[in-house]
Swiss-Prot record:
Keyword flag Cytoplasm: yes
GO biological process, one term: L-arginine biosynthetic process
CDD domains, per database record: AAK_NAGK-C
E.C. code: 2.7.2.8
GO cellular component, one term: cytoplasm
Species, as recorded: Syntrophobacter fumaroxidans (strain DSM 10017 / MPOB)
GO molecular function annotations of the record: acetylglutamate kinase activity; ATP binding
Higher taxonomy: Bacteria, Pseudomonadati, Thermodesulfobacteriota, Syntrophobacteria, Syntrophobacterales
Keywords: Amino-acid biosynthesis, Arginine biosynthesis, ATP-binding, Cytoplasm, Kinase, Nucleotide-binding, Transferase
Protein name (database record): Acetylglutamate kinase
Enzyme class at the top of the EC tree: transferase
Keyword Nucleus carried by entry: no
Subcellular localization, as worded in the UniProt entry: Cytoplasm
Length: 298
């Protein structure tokens, strides 16, 4: 009993610090598949709301999209961690993300006592998007090659008034990462990047990115517990990071530069990873910050 009391006392300063603040959580990976992890995620979100924090959930769905594409005999191709998306693939992406996964998450949270509302970026023009251009650099003396990866977008603008209205109504937004272009075209947007832009637009206290590894790993596979923006940018430049970790770290950098206080990349395979990150001294995963305490900013 004393140990349990100690846990509550440890959480108290964090509850005070984040009361009334916004925390954006990117939900994805194994935490969306294993039943125990799904339950712990939903409980974490509901508890945050009950103690006065405003959680905003942005979800992925890459594996589920991949399985659906495979069922219809369509191959999945990736470039720089992004899914190459033609018109047929976009239809599947939207169906799986906005029509299936989003509603499952809403139902899961509501079943545990929350009041979640599902949205895609097309609802109320929540996420205005433009086509994403990917560049492949060949060398110092050559112009970069522009790679067309189809209907893959990047966030142009987030209409935060919708999210403010939901938060004011004691509701928990659950957002599918589908955006809308100027001509009404639909874009598939990486969920990490959507979460980062939303966190920046809301000036969130924290952005938490859930993944299927311990956090950011170095070249030897060891966990890096803390990175500054400059160190994270170096890791991107020297190709220490691979695959899906690339957009996560880029998202963290963008969010911090947009005013988010701190970003955490956490192991979603750990039950209650969100609560451990926010309400304990040790935390989990990798934290990314603008500068370390005491570091000169120039």
């Amino acid at each position: 009993m004393i140990e349990k009391a100690g846990i509550l006392i440890e959480a108290l300063p964090y509850i005070r610090r984040f009361y009334g603040k916004t925390v954006v959580i990117k939900y994805g990976g194994n935490a969306m598949v294993a039943e125990e992890l799904k339950e712990s995620f939903a409980k974490d979100i509901v508890l945050m709301k009950y103690i006065g924090i405003n959680p905003v959930v942005v979800h992925g769905g890459g594996p589920q999209i991949g399985r659906m594409l495979k069922r219809i005999g369509k191959e999945s191709d990736f470039c720089a961690g992004m899914r190459v998306t033609d018109a047929d693939t976009m239809d599947i992406v939207e169906m799986v993300l906005a029509g299936k996964i989003n509603k499952e998450i809403v139902s899961l949270i509501n079943r545990h006592g929350g009041h979640a509302v599902g949205l895609s970026g097309k609802d109320g023009n929540l996420i205005e998007a433009r086509k994403l251009h990917v560049y492949r650099y060949k060398g110092d003396d050559q112009p970069p090659e522009i790679i067309d990866i189809g209907l893959v977008g990047e966030v142009n603008r987030v209409n935060v008034s919708i999210l403010d209205t939901l938060a004011g109504g004691n509701l928990i937004p659950v957002i599918a990462p589908v955006g809308v272009g100027e001509q009404g075209e639909t874009y598939n947007i990486n969920a990490d990047l959507v979460a980062g832009h939303i966190a920046g637009a809301l000036q969130a206290a924290k952005l938490v990115l859930m993944t299927d590894v311990e956090g950011v790993l170095d070249g030897g596979g060891n966990l890096i517990s803390s990175l500054t923006v400059a160190e994270a940018a170096d890791a991107l430049q020297d190709e220490t990071l691979k695959g899906g970790m690339i957009p996560k770290v880029q998202c963290a950098i963008d969010a911090l530069q947009s005013g988010v206080d701190k970003v955490h990349i956490v192991d979603g395979r750990v039950p209650h990873a969100i609560l451990l990150e926010i309400f304990t001294d040790a935390g989990v995963g990798t934290e990314i910050v603008r500068y370390r305490r005491g570091q000169s900013v120039g």
